[in-house]
Amino acid sequence: METSMRYTSNSKSMKIHAKEKVPVNSKTHLQLHGELDTGTGAPSYFCAMIRHFFPEASTGLGVGLHYDKRQKLRCLVRGKKEFPVRADKRVTFNIKGRCDIDQDLNQKNPKGAAEFAWNIMDFKEDQDVRIKVGYEMFDKVPYMQIRENNWTLNANMKGKWNLRYDL
């Protein structure tokens, strides 16, 4: 099980996130993940999703259900396509999108982004770094991510940010 501690610019409490991937076959897994709000002591959300990877097309697709304490039960579909910029795939151009559909079949929170990702292995001894720079199409905002081993910082040009530490 993967666990992390998360803190965002619009939250007053730390969140504990847990994720488990249960293999179905070599290209498909069931992904279960949820979050506990340490301020309230209650779960923030829970999600179950079937994810499939198409290696010949460098593409991933996921379909699942998401329960949120505010927006209740939703169905979601997400996809990502990766285009290598370099032959070693350390620099990629990614297109990704997500669509949530509520119980009344209304589309909620659409997301779509184009980004460049640069993976720097052994930046220093035992230190890997990933830098992402992208543009979120629906929110119309540039964003960036810097990841160093267990630490991840995400920020956008509207002043929103979040920090994650993988345990």
UniProtKB/Swiss-Prot annotation:
The keyword Chloroplast applies. Residues 32-55, 82-87, 121-127, 153-158 are chloroplast intermembrane. It is found in: Plastid, Etioplast membrane; Plastid, Chloroplast outer membrane. It comes from the Eukaryota. Voltage-dependent rectifying anion channel that facilitates the translocation between chloroplast and cytoplasm of phosphorylated carbohydrates such as triosephosphate, 3-phosphoglycerate and inorganic phosphate (Pi) depending of ATP to triosephosphate ratio in the plastidial intermembrane space; in high triosephosphate/ATP conditions (e.g. photosynthesis), export of triosphosphate from chloroplast (outward rectifying channels), but in high ATP/triosephosphate conditions (e.g. dark phase), import of phosphosolutes (inward rectifying channels). GO terms for biological process: regulation of monoatomic anion transport. GO terms for molecular function: porin activity; voltage-gated monoatomic anion channel activity. Signal peptide: none annotated. Belongs to the plastid outer envelope porin OEP21 (TC 1.B.29) family. The keyword Plastid applies. This is Outer envelope pore protein 21B, chloroplastic. GO terms for cellular component: chloroplast envelope; chloroplast outer membrane; etioplast membrane; mitochondrion; pore complex. It comes from Arabidopsis thaliana (Mouse-ear cress). Keywords: Chloroplast, Ion transport, Membrane, Plastid, Plastid outer membrane, Porin, Transmembrane, Transmembrane beta strand, Transport. Residues 1-21, 66-71, 98-110, 138-142 are cytoplasmic.
